[in-house]
Amino acid sequence: MLEAYRQHVAERAALGIPPLPLSKQQTQALVELLQNPPAGEEAFLVELLTYRVPAGVDDAAKVKAEFLAKVAKGEVACGLVSKVKATELLGTMLGGYNVKPLIDLLANDETGAASAEGLKKTLLVFDFFHDVKELADKGNANAKSVLQSWADGEWFTTRPAVPASQKLTVFKVTGETNTDDLSPAPDAWSRPDIPLHALAMLKNPRPGIEPDEAGARGPLKQLEGLAAKGNLIAYVGDVVGTGSSRKSATNSVLWFTGEDIPFVPNKRFGGVCLGSKIAPIFFNTMEDAGALPIEIDAGQMDMGDEIELQVDEASGKVTALKNGTVIAESQLKTLVILDEVRAGGRIPLIIGRGLTTKAREALGLPPSTLFRLPQNPADAGTGYSLAQKMVGRACGLPEGKGVLPGTYCEPKMTTVGSQDTTGPMTRDELKDLACLGFSADLVMQSFCHTAAYPKLVDVKMHRELPSFISTRGGVSLRPGDGVIHSWLN
């Protein structure tokens, strides 16, 4: 396994990207090696276990979590990983298969404190919340400290806030960049492999952009040159992210401008995206990924410029300076974005806020004042369009009422359609969210884009994706069953 893995590492390094995360089979082999390590490989094996296994409810994560749980409980002896170390590693896996073992370990004298620390930063606990509360009610001190930490929002306050001022190096793409420039359709097959797919970003020559290999490999050398200046790179454009809604476009931008998610292989978050105009869906996808998207005049920002970005957290005013001179001013879309960035994304913020609310209710505490609340627009009494009423109905508003533009709301989705060029990415996102069952009434997966001329990766997807959807209570069509829209209608 190690020999084959090192060969894979070398092949990927030649492309300038990290190896793929470990598969279920590789993780099973790794677990066996950890219990009987070849001489000289000990540190490498622990590093692989720590950093190269996916988190959430991936198949490989299950193998890792089960092994660590056995070590932590003393059921398996492993000289390289102590009980406490195993518990700490369980605490880095975000949610899913690690949660139950961590809760079991709370009552253990040796590992209780370490498992409490892990759970304090784990948001994806879902129904296991009740197990922690039950333990706390029985007087378990570790469970009490977890509940108190969730109530205090420590998962949020221990993360860095958006800096009031930060230095950025500008990666400027003039004119309009659409999502096909960032995530080309002919490269759709590689989208779930974020670092590999990112090589195709901006691969076609355009003013100011120098692809390493025109039509095949994007401007990596140019980006490396900018990174050498030592600042975060900001993606800056005149019009950014128009066209088809593609999470893969955000993934590619973040691969070059974001930061690694700790303990999660080949995923990044954060980064700054500045555009004179940013397309709404792209803007939202950036928010989900913990980036800071800001609409601001980018006319005086040029490739390679070092700028200072100042954000006033009280008013949401944004100022961009070059050489100490103000070159543009703007306003954050909403102050809540500052919380989204701090939480590591809009989705972690929504889930985390919910967890904090639940914990405070369980402890009989008043609602938290930790988070910024969105300011919703006032109703001018002008009536609502049908679309506004439909969203209003999904948000539980009374009949005839609608949602105004600029309103913060969390609509309930009863029908979700997933098509196949994005299906594997959707699967990865669901794994990251520790999803073991869908709560929407209908989740349907189609195979209409790849049924006619499948590549090898598509054949593999046709084989594996249906069971992923159906085991979670979704409906999976078969290749050749027809177009997603006709089924949904």
Which role fits each region the language model picked out?
Residues 2-31, 36, 337-350:
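Amphipathic alpha-helical packing elements
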Residues 24-32, 55-74, 94-106, 125-136:
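Amphipathic alpha-helical scaffolding segments comprising HEAT/armadillo-like alpha-solenoid repeats
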Residues 41-46, 57-63, 437-445:
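Short N-terminal amphipathic alpha-helices
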Residues 31-48:
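Generic amphipathic, hydrophobic interface segment in small proteins and small subunits
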Residues 38, 78-79, 108-111, 140:
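Short inter-helical turns and helix N-cap capping residues of alpha-solenoid HEAT/ARM repeat scaffolds
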Residues 92, 98, 102, 107, ...:
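Fe-S-dependent hydro-lyases/dehydratases of central metabolism
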Residues 17-20, 43-59, 73, 80-95, ...:
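Structural detector for internal amphipathic alpha-helices that build alpha-solenoid repeat scaffolds
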Residues 1-2, 41:
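N-terminal leader/presequence-like segments
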